[in-house]
Amino acid sequence: MQLNPSEISELIKSKIEGLSVTSEFRTQGTIVSLTDGIVRVHGLSDVMQGEMLEFPGGTFGLALNLERDSVGAVILGAYEHLKEGDIVKCTSRILEVPVGEALLGRVVNALGQPIDGKGPIAAEGTEPIEKIAPGVVWRKSVDQPVQTGLKSIDSMVPVGRGQRELIIGDRQTGKTAVAIDAIINQKGEDVICIYVAIGQKASSIANVVRKLEEVGAMAYTIVVVASASESAAMQYIAPYSGCTMGEYFRDKGQDALIVYDDLTKQAWAYRQISLLLRRPPGREAYPGDVFYLHSRLLERAARVNADYVEKATGGKVKGKTGSLTALPIIETQAGDVTAFVPTNVISITDGQIFLESDLFNAGIRPAINAGISVSRVGGAAQTKVIKKLGGGIRLALAQYRELAAFAQFASDLDEATRKQLERGKMATELMKQSQYATLKVSEMALTLFALNKGYFDDVDIKRALAFESALKSHIRSHHGAILDKIEASKELDAETEKALEAAIQEFKQNGTY
């Protein structure tokens, strides 16, 4: 076969036209050392702090230490296949995780990858895990409640939408139980929940997920897991990943609730990473920026105004405010709240719920110490009926604790003091509540109203909870309209008060418990 010169030139021309040449300019370096999930990389001259690095085999890492002749990076995930001399590339990107409605009902790892065996997630997009918190001008004051369904919290330390309320206590005092009850109680409240499990046993996390599925709470919940078996790097980034997923809903004008369980283990993971990176240790061997570790995370929980939502959605959503409420959990050692991390988080948050081992072991559950638990902004968000009725409970408990200390030494007590002690004992008894047995506002109001009006005064303390349960059943069966009215209006007017009082008196005359 013979080709003439013109055909050859045409053939070459067409081949050149069909050839696509793209140049890719990326800084790359080589692995110098690799120990305990920490990599030293030489040659990454243009790398940025916090930048995502690409390793062979589809593995990624974060550049944390920028030194004169090398970069200290932490690997996200498995690193057994990596070796010295491997090529590392810069990506010029911050680590991003998937966000969107598709994540609801799913269990994901700290990178947003599904680990529940239910197939891939068709996410609406990805967002960086590190974001700057909304500024003061974009915020709105907290004035809507997050009902936890727990009498002791909603009446004494109320939580508002956009608030950061710390749950603090020793191990095995019911911290997770309080947070899970709060998530379960959001059913039908149009609040999206994110549960971030950090450094926990996989079996404990599986139990939580199973319970949320049982009660139908997974439909509006995302579970982010960095279990105890995962690397310190994954435990360190998990809260930021969960926060980004929650911010997606906040910025759309919706309400979200995020639980960090717990931030003590995140601080431990960060301390481990920092020490391996040879950063200078400070108090309790934590690095100097451990306060910033938690403050930059918790400041992202906020109530944002309509202008912010409109700006974030590009004008698609107008006239709606959004919120992200945070319930961080901190574990103390032997009740020491003056340790480094607990004091840091107490100073960052808008209040704290103290859970005590002594109360828990005495059968008072949730084991909330009403004296030192406080909500700094939640009072403005409390429902009117609970605010009206709950004030007396806190006072009764405060007076009871004060008098109980003196009563131990006094042989004879006057009638008024004895009554106050009895009222305090009864209030303590009625604040008890079983796990997963959350209450509606109207049911809570009924108990508080009956206690304030003295209807429990002649009830044997051992029968108090049985009396309360029977009273609720009676009112629900025979006077359901009263409860419905309180539930709808969240208020207690004079007419409803009279009707409720008459209904309770009727039960006291005829009811059995």
From Swiss-Prot:
Q: Which reaction does it catalyse?
A: ATP + H2O + 4 H(+)(in) = ADP + phosphate + 5 H(+)(out)
Origin superkingdom: Bacteria
Site features described as Required for activity, chain residue numbers: 373
Membrane topology according to the record: Peripheral membrane protein
Q: Does the keyword Plastid apply?
A: no
Compartments, record wording: Cell inner membrane
User: GO CC annotation: what is one?
Assistant: proton-transporting ATP synthase complex
Q: EC number(s) in its UniProt entry?
A: 7.1.2.2
Going by the UniProt record, its keywords in alphabetical order are:
ATP synthesis, ATP-binding, Cell inner membrane, Cell membrane, CF(1), Hydrogen ion transport, Ion transport, Membrane, Nucleotide-binding, Translocase, Transport
Q: Which SUPFAM superfamilies match?
A: C-terminal domain of alpha and beta subunits of F1 ATP synthase, N-terminal domain of alpha and beta subunits of F1 ATP synthase, P-loop containing nucleoside triphosphate hydrolases
Q: What class of enzyme is it?
A: translocase
Pfam families linked to this entry: ATP-synt_ab, ATP-synt_ab_C, ATP-synt_ab_N
Record-linked CDD domains: ATP-synt_F1_alpha_C, ATP-synt_F1_alpha_N, F1-ATPase_alpha_CD
Single Gene Ontology MF annotation = ATP binding
Q: List the InterPro entries hit by this protein, alphabetically.
A: ATP_synth_asu-like_sf, ATP_synth_asu_C, ATP_synth_asu_C_sf, ATP_synth_F1_a_nt-bd_dom, ATP_synth_F1_asu, ATPase_a/bsu_AS, ATPase_F1/V1/A1_a/bsu_N, ATPase_F1/V1/A1_a/bsu_N_sf
Q: Where does ATP bind?
A: 169-176
Q: Which family does it belong to?
A: Belongs to the ATPase alpha/beta chains family.
Q: What does the record give as the function of this protein?
A: Produces ATP from ADP in the presence of a proton gradient across the membrane. The alpha chain is a regulatory subunit.
Q: Which PANTHER family does this entry report, sorted A to Z?
A: ATP SYNTHASE SUBUNIT ALPHA, MITOCHONDRIAL
Subunit structure and binding partners: F-type ATPases have 2 components, CF(1) - the catalytic core - and CF(0) - the membrane proton channel. CF(1) has five subunits: alpha(3), beta(3), gamma(1), delta(1), epsilon(1). CF(0) has three main subunits: a(1), b(2) and c(9-12). The alpha and beta chains form an alternating ring which encloses part of the gamma chain. CF(1) is attached to CF(0) by a central stalk formed by the gamma and epsilon chains, while a peripheral stalk is formed by the delta and b chains.
Protein name, entry field: ATP synthase subunit alpha
